[in-house]
Amino acid sequence: MSQSQFDPYVQNGGTTVAIAGDGFAILAGDTRSVNGYNINTRFQPRVHEVGDDLVIGASGFEADALALVKRIQQRIDLYHDNHERKMSAQSCACMVRTLLYGKRFFPYYVYTTVAGIDKEGKGEIYSFDPVGSYEREWCRAGGSAANFITPFLDNQVNLHNQYVPGSHGKERKPRRLLKLEEAMKITTDAFTSAGERHIEVGDSVLVKIITKEGVETRIIPLKKD
């Protein structure tokens, strides 16, 4: 006897990488959208400008991702009407938390990241789980290839288990905020390597670079197969 099941979610792939640096934040996402072994489209953005020099990264179930980004944009517009000022990245993160937590019984199947610039001019990265728990981080990989990219970021950005030469394992290497070109090279290498190992990563990477001057967009080509 067969039993019908309700499964409203689809994994459409998508991987995002975020790095906070000295005077900038990078949020990048690959553009391949899949359903199993089928490619739906080769250009589906996973990073979205929502105004106020804020960028949202959303990957996972594409319908939920687009719905969440639309709700965030609506909330930012409402914030402008009520307060007549720009929304900060920290305020945006708190708002996204309430949106995700409010849907906790039927959550958005999305890996969400918020990127912006703080009051001191440093990059801000906030990463979320599907029900709203979040934290500020130096870097974060989310989505289908996160397991491949996270160890690379831990090594190159977080400097996990790395020590000052000659200290005999007693003095850890201090973390530092990266320069823009350093972060861009790490981002490019991360997606290039993931594309060689994961079938859901490919086609191109859409990169949003947030600075105090605004948001710059770059596209990095990836393999098409």
Swiss-Prot record:
Signal sequence, renumbered to the chain: none
Domain of life: Eukaryota
Record localization: Cytoplasm; Nucleus
Keywords associated with the record: Cytoplasm, Nucleus, Proteasome
Single GO biological process annotation from the record: proteolysis involved in protein catabolic process
Cellular compartments per GO CC: cytoplasm; cytosol; nucleus; proteasome core complex; proteasome core complex, beta-subunit complex
CDD domains linked to this entry: proteasome_beta_type_1
Pfam families to which the protein is assigned, alphabetical: Proteasome (PF00227)
Alphabetized SUPFAM superfamilies for the sequence: N-terminal nucleophile aminohydrolases (Ntn hydrolases) (SSF56235)
Claim: Cell membrane is one of the keywords in the record: no
UniProt main location, coarse: cytoplasm
PROSITE patterns associated with the record: PROTEASOME_BETA_1, PROTEASOME_BETA_2
Gene3D superfamilies: Glutamine Phosphoribosylpyrophosphate, subunit 1, domain 1
Task performed by this protein: Non-catalytic component of the proteasome, a multicatalytic proteinase complex which is characterized by its ability to cleave peptides with Arg, Phe, Tyr, Leu, and Glu adjacent to the leaving group at neutral or slightly basic pH. The proteasome has an ATP-dependent proteolytic activity.
Quaternary state and interactors: The 26S proteasome consists of a 20S proteasome core and two 19S regulatory subunits. The 20S proteasome core is composed of 28 subunits that are arranged in four stacked rings, resulting in a barrel-shaped structure. The two end rings are each formed by seven alpha subunits, and the two central rings are each formed by seven beta subunits. The catalytic chamber with the active sites is on the inside of the barrel.
Family according to the record: Belongs to the peptidase T1B family.
Official protein name in the record: Probable proteasome subunit beta type-6
